[in-house]
Amino acid sequence: MADAAVIEKLEEGFKKLEAATDCKSLLKKYLTKSVFDQLKGKKTSLGATLLDVIQSGVENLDSGVGVYAPDAEAYTLFAPLFDPIIEDYHKGFKQTDKHPNKDFGDVNQFVNVDPDGKFVISTRVRCGRSMEGYPFNPCLTEAQYKEMESKVSSTLSNLEGELKGTYYPLTGMTKDVQQKLIDDHFLFKEGDRFLQAANACRYWPTGRGIYHNDNKTFLVWCNEEDHLRIISMQMGGDLGQVYRRLVSAVNEIEKRVPFSHHDRLGFLTFCPTNLGTTVRASVHIKLPKLAANREKLEEVAGKYSLQVRGTRGEHTEAEGGVYDISNKRRMGLTEFQAVKEMQDGILELIKMEKEM
């Protein structure tokens, strides 16, 4: 049972949400009085409460979603709040649906989407993973952060061939290494206000680090927003090459580190927007003609379930007409389908740009 002080804070937070008439978050939409009353006293076996779930969305009323899972059990215990939010965000993933088993499919179906190199600047495919037996950021102790980092770095040090590389802990990182990683756009910063408010940045930078291979086409973030972010990327539009590299890396890491998986929700992550396949396949792409008509761009993107963001990701502008375009759907379809959807959409956008 959650203690009185927590419940009092929850009551205050609920009042604040109710009063915020211009708040458009999914948290506000689905945290009804009856759901709130049903959940406010509950506590996971690791001690997480509804407060851990909603505090970021209460503090940041401009959140799009507004909830995070403090541990794996939270998705089950606080399901009356998470399930409708998941259904709303992952359009059509109903509360009775079950995410399919992992399936990377025929990796040779992926191609270079821009062989002439006129439109696509770079291509990236990433996935998130949580290590079994550990809670998510807000509930991790300093000792757990250190333990996880040592498991991850020793696992990665066994990678061979194209994936072979170096692990750089954030703790005690020299200014030179730091600058080098910033120049390569590899270094992640301490979380933004949304993550800060979710208590995702405790004991920073303990247990956080970055691994990359020698060609800088394969990257792993340790204990950023998720326990692991596994990233494959390169300049140009060869999605096939990028995808194949990611798949081989995930399979290698999984042999040594068991991942948190949920029967219904797929692979578990800190933020419910990343559940399921956890896969985000994206390109940085120049579409000057389509970009002049943002509505048209959004319309085609919507048809292929693509998400259009600014150049530097979420909450940013398109610099020099360069957009970050990715698959929006991560749940209720396989890894193969998620990336295929993105490939089909990008090919269509390029075709339209050429015809304009």
Curated annotation (Swiss-Prot):
What tissue expression does the UniProt record report for this protein? Muscle (at protein level).
**Which residues bind L-arginine per the record?**
G64, V65, G66, V67, Y68, E225, C271, E314
**Phosphagen kinase N-terminal domain boundaries:** 9-91
| Taxonomic source organism | Scylla serrata (Mud crab)
Q: Which family does it belong to?
A: Belongs to the ATP:guanido phosphotransferase family.
EC number(s) given by UniProt: 2.7.3.3
Instruction: Please name the InterPro entries in this protein's record.
Output: ATP-guanido_PTrfase, ATP-guanido_PTrfase_AS, ATP-guanido_PTrfase_cat, ATP-guanido_PTrfase_N, ATP-guanido_PTrfase_N_sf, Gln_synth/guanido_kin_cat_dom
* BP-aspect Gene Ontology terms: phosphocreatine biosynthetic process
Q: What is this protein called?
A: Arginine kinase Scy s 2
Keyword field: Allergen, ATP-binding, Kinase, Nucleotide-binding, Transferase
Q: Which Gene3D superfamilies match?
A: ATP:guanido phosphotransferase, N-terminal domain, Glutamine synthetase/guanido kinase, catalytic domain
Task: Show where the Phosphagen kinase C-terminal domain sits.
Answer: 119-356
Q: Does the keyword Ribosomal protein apply?
A: no
Q: Where does ATP bind?
A: 122-126, 185, 229, 280-284, 309-314
Record GO cellular component, one term: extracellular space
Q: Which SUPFAM superfamilies match?
A: Glutamine synthetase/guanido kinase, Guanido kinase N-terminal domain
What is the recorded function of this protein according to its Swiss-Prot or TrEMBL entry? Catalyzes the reversible transfer of high energy ATP gamma-phosphate group to L-arginine.
Q: Which Pfam families match?
A: ATP-gua_Ptrans, ATP-gua_PtransN
MF terms (GO), sorted A to Z: arginine kinase activity; ATP binding; creatine kinase activity
Task: Name the domain of life this protein comes from.
Answer: Eukaryota
Q: Which reaction(s) are listed as its catalytic activity?
A: L-arginine + ATP = N(omega)-phospho-L-arginine + ADP + H(+)
